């Protein structure tokens, strides 16, 4: 049964609101689900419940809790889309990494689940990459992560498996940025990159106008196989 919980932030900063979905039996592992700039909306909750159905404990933290708590926005509604952009402009990704670390510690110590993965979308895809470079999570997956090309210098710190889903027509990630990601990460033994020809940002959304059914199903199947291999 999904519930809303709070997770202690690092350094006593406060409490991170989070959405929690758990399987009916002991979880095989935990997955931290990092949302797009639209917050823990219905689409992210659907993804959490899907992971629970596959036997994982899923935790989706409210990444904007410091200045816009409770944001649940719809990308297909223009004023809400613009609010999401405004939230992103205020956001400090370093705080996001701290929140991922806080969630991982919570899952391991309070939930008693030792293996932890991260899956993120858009801004969350960038944070999934940063989690792979800066934390000890066991595996990470990023969908259409933004600004990863600006952080390739951190790739040498990746010690656990990372998978990135890259739509080639992503209007937020230029072809030059995609080329840089491939040049920087293709040689890395822990990194797997998948391109999706002609697809755009948000293609794996749970619903809405951005979703591409075939591409979403393919990417999600690859993610499930990846986590099954590296988390159990």
What positions do the PLM features span?
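N-terminal cap/leader regions of alpha/beta-hydrolase-fold enzymes
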Residues: 1-232
């Amino acid at each position: 049964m999904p519930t809303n919980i709070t997770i202690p932030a690092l350094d006593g900063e406060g409490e991170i609101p989070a959405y929690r979905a758990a399987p009916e039996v002991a979880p095989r592992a935990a997955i931290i689900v990092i949302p797009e700039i639209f917050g823990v909306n219905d689409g992210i909750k659907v993804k959490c419940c899907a992971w629970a159905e596959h036997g994982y404990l899923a935790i989706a933290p409210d990444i904007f809790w410091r200045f816009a708590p409770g944001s649940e926005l719809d990308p297909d509604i223009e004023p809400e889309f613009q609010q999401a952009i405004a939230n992103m402009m205020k956001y400090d990704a370093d705080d996001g990494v701290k929140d991922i670390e806080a969630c991982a510690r919570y899952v391991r110590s309070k939930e008693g689940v030792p293996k932890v993965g991260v899956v993120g979308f858009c801004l969350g895809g960038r944070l999934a990459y940063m989690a792979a470079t800066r934390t000890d999570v066991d595996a990470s997956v990023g969908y259409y992560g933004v600004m990863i090309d600006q952080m390739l210098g951190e790739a040498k710190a990746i010690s656990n498996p990372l998978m990135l889903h890259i739509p080639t027509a992503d209007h937020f990630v230029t072809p030059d940025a995609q080329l840089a990601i491939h040049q920087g990460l293709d040689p890395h033994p822990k990194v797997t990159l998948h391109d999706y020809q002609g697809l755009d940002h948000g293609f794996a959304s749970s619903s809405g106008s951005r979703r591409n059914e075939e591409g979403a199903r393919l990417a999600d199947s690859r993610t499930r196989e990846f986590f099954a291999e590296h988390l159990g």
